[in-house]
Curated annotation (Swiss-Prot):
Pfam family, one: YcgL
Gene coding for it: ycgL
Top-rank taxon, per record: Bacteria
Protein name: Protein YcgL
InterPro entries registered for this protein in UniProt: YcgL-like_sf, YcgL_dom
Native organism: Escherichia coli O139:H28 (strain E24377A / ETEC)
Domain YcgL: 12-96
Length: 108
């Protein structure tokens, strides 16, 4: 029981689900198995949610593939956060860019 005058803070958790239809796509919600605030169309495209983990957000400074402040804000305001996969690396474009820079450097 908290001491008088001390407010017990509510910890912020999120529950993360993996998409059954889209690789590297995750849905963060506030409560386990509560998708009531997630739009129906999003759920259709997401497929059957597969529980990945339950994660405390308090005291955490960062997440691996998402901005923690954006996640917290989205959970508070809309009740969910959708993490999409990072764009694929275009290795050919990177290589051509580097080669173009080398060509420019040798022509000077």
């Amino acid at each position: 029981m908290p001491k008088p005058g001390i407010l017990k803070s509510k910890s912020m958790f999120c529950v993360i689900y993996r998409s059954s239809k889209r690789d590297q796509t995750y849905l963060y919600v506030e409560k386990k198995d509560d998708f009531s605030r997630v739009p129906e169309e999003l759920m259709k495209g997401f497929g059957q949610p597969q529980l990945a983990m339950i994660l405390p957000l308090d005291g955490r400074k960062k997440l691996v593939n998402a901005d923690i402040e954006k996640v917290k804000l989205a959970l508070t305001e809309q009740g969910y956060y959708l993490q999409l996969p990072p764009p694929p690396e275009d290795l050919l474009k990177q290589h051509l860019s580097v080669m173009g820079q080398k060509t420019d450097d040798t022509n000077k």
